[in-house]
Amino acid sequence: MRLKGIFKEKSSTGKLGILFLLMVVSVILHTLLAQAVIVLFTDITLIAVSMMQFTSQSEIDAVKFIQMLSAIGLFITPTLLYAYLCDFDLKLILNFNRQSLLLAIAIMLLINPFIAFIYEWNMSFNIPDWMLVYDDNAEKITNSFLKMNTLGDLFFNLLVIAIIPAIGEELLFRGYLQQNISQWTGKPHVAIIITAILFSAIHMQFQGFLPRFALGIVLGYLFYWSGSLWLPIIAHLLNNAMAVTFSYPTFSDYAYLTENTATWQQAFFSFMAVGLLVFLLQKNLSIKKD
């Protein structure tokens, strides 16, 4: 039986339901697989992992492993299966020129003061305590993950925190959602905004909602202008990889480059510099299309 494109003629609502079902089933199976591996091949109990006491490096690594497979199960596997079953074009292999890639990288390097300023503003909001529980748990996990002693820890973190999320989240949010919302509404800019909202909301970190939303807007326009997922994937990867790399003791002197603090003057110049780079990027891509 030929499965490729079997759901191609389904309605947009039906296809969305198929993707949601694939995501639920996939993340459950991947999480169960990760837990089974831990139980069978380590001395760590799932109770210890679920309590998140992080009393040893092995427990931290176990949580990283579960998070890695869960992320693959939530973002990568279902989106690729959906693309196969619905014959959906993810636009993953379209070419882009070197200048566009360099401009996208420069944007991510220069945008941090502006994002940091938004983060501080978001932190000033009066957020209910029940919401802050999610932020506290996320901060606890992140701080535990970023305690690295060896190059092996650094490379594992780059895989779990940078590479897999960059590929998986961009496949789902820009590769699928943004394209489909744009088709449904006929308004690509609205699609970018809605996708950025969903992108930020799924992380369940309310004190970081606005900066992640702003990042989602940038990633959305990188995809919209270039027509290739590789630009937002590389930009997303760079953003996460800098935070991981500068937390490693050898590179900790550069941690200020990713700090969540910035003056309004720094934010202003960051915004203006990024605006100029965005203009150059759009112009560069327009010339390429012509």
Give a label for each model feature.
Residues F7, L237-D290:
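C-terminal membrane module of polytopic membrane proteins
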Residues E59-L74, K140-I164, W264-A273:
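Hydrophobic alpha-helical transmembrane segments
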